[in-house]
Regions:
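Catalytic glycan-binding domains that act on GlcNAc-containing polysaccharides
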Residues: 2-195
């Protein structure tokens, strides 16, 4: 289905066709493919906001509600960006699951919340991944005094890098520069776009 969707989205000629495909994928609970299709459509100047940010199926949404340590909209936004709601996603760097946790980070976080670390559960059990990922983001938010921009950058690139960037470029929380300028100075394009 993934290959078929990729071929189909690249061959779409009208906005109407694109909307039909994305709606169909959402109805089939193929959220990650719907997000992929909507991202590809943007490259062709087809932007449909209400389709670009789908809410996952009810069962998964309930899992977020029951397991998140952070506001659900934040956990959903992180998961959409990190994995497009693909619970089995594994990045080239080795990050795993819905919230794309690196195994080492997951192990440390599991210990902090008195959970047994089980690597395979990062991709097999959404509740496990959401619990660990949301707790880790909560820690980043606390570490950077409630700054979502800094916490998101730390979640994606690591807190040590963010601390280095604060020393190098200045701290938007202190008024050294505005937040948008700080974000634009992030040297890793993936993290800059992520934030």
């Amino acid at each position: 289905l993934k290959s078929f969707t990729r071929k189909l989205i690249n061959d779409m000629e009208t906005t109407k066709d694109t909307v039909i495909l994305i709606k169909l994928l959402n109805q089939m609970n193929k959220t990650s493919l719907a997000i992929y299709a909507s991202r590809r459509a943007v490259y062709r100047n087809v932007y449909i906001p209400y389709l670009n940010f789908p809410i996952p199926e009810e069962k998964l949404l309930k899992t977020y509600q029951e397991n998140s340590y952070i506001p659900i909209n934040v956990a959903l936004a992180i998961s959409r960006q990190e994995s497009a709601f693909d619970k089995g996603a594994v990045s080239r760097a080795g990050a795993r699951g819905l919230m794309q946790l690196m195994p080492r980070t997951a192990r440390i976080t599991a210990r902090k919340i008195n959970h047994k670390y089980i690597r395979k559960n990062l991709t097999l059990k959404p509740s496990y991944n959401i619990k660990l990922g949301s707790y880790y983001f909560k820690e980043m938010l606390e570490k950077f005094n409630g700054s979502y921009a800094l916490a998101l950058a730390a979640y994606n690139a690591g807190p040590n890098r963010v601390s280095r960037w604060l020393k190098t470029y200045g701290d938007p929380r202190k008024g050294d520069l505005d937040q948008v300028t700080w974000i634009e100075l992030i040297p890793i394009s993936e993290t800059r776009n992520y934030v």
